[in-house]
C-alpha cells in the first residue's frame, strides 16, 4: 500500500554521495512535518556503529542507510550498503503506519542496497545482528 509520500531529491543525492564518494558513512531519513515527503535528517562520516545507533530515536520511526564494513575471513574487508527501517515498539501508531506504507517509495529509489534490516528494538539492529545478516548474504 502506497502512502503517496514522495522522496526528496536530496535523499537520492546523499545516497549517491555515500555510494560513490565513500565519505558519508550513514544517512538518517525522516518524514517532513506534513508527512508528505521523505527527507534527509542527518548524514555522518563517523565510523562508530554506536554513533549510528544513537541517531535512532527510541520513540520515533526513521529510515537509514549504513555503509557496513566487516571482515570476511580470508577474503578480507567487505562493505554492504544496508537499508534500515526503524519502527520502534514505543512509536505512535499513526507514524508507524505512514512509515510502513512509505518504505517502498524510498527503498525502490535507492538502487544498490544489498541488505535490508527491520528493527523494532535495538537488539534487532545491534552490530552482531546486522553482521550475521550481511555475512550470510555474502557469497
Curated annotation (Swiss-Prot):
Where is this protein primarily located? cytoplasm
Q: Does the keyword Magnesium apply?
A: no
Q: List the disulfide bonds.
A: none
The listed locations are: Cytoplasm; Cytoplasm, Cytoskeleton; Nucleus matrix
Q: What cellular component terms from Gene Ontology apply here?
A: actin cortical patch; actin cytoskeleton; cytoplasm; nuclear matrix
Which sequence ranges are marked TM in the entry?
A: none
Report the record's Gene Ontology biological process terms: actin filament depolymerization; actin filament severing; cell division
Q: Does the keyword Cell division apply?
A: yes
Q: Give the matching PANTHER family.
A: COFILIN-RELATED
Q: What does this protein do?
A: Controls reversibly actin polymerization and depolymerization in a pH-sensitive manner. It has the ability to bind G- and F-actin in a 1:1 ratio of cofilin to actin. Binding to F-actin is regulated by tropomyosin. It is the major component of intranuclear and cytoplasmic actin rods. Required for accumulation of actin at the cell division site via depolymerizing actin at the cell ends. In association with myosin II has a role in the assembly of the contractile ring via severing actin filaments. Involved in the maintenance of the contractile ring once formed.
Write down what this protein is called: Cofilin
User: Which organism was this protein described from?
Assistant: Mycosarcoma maydis
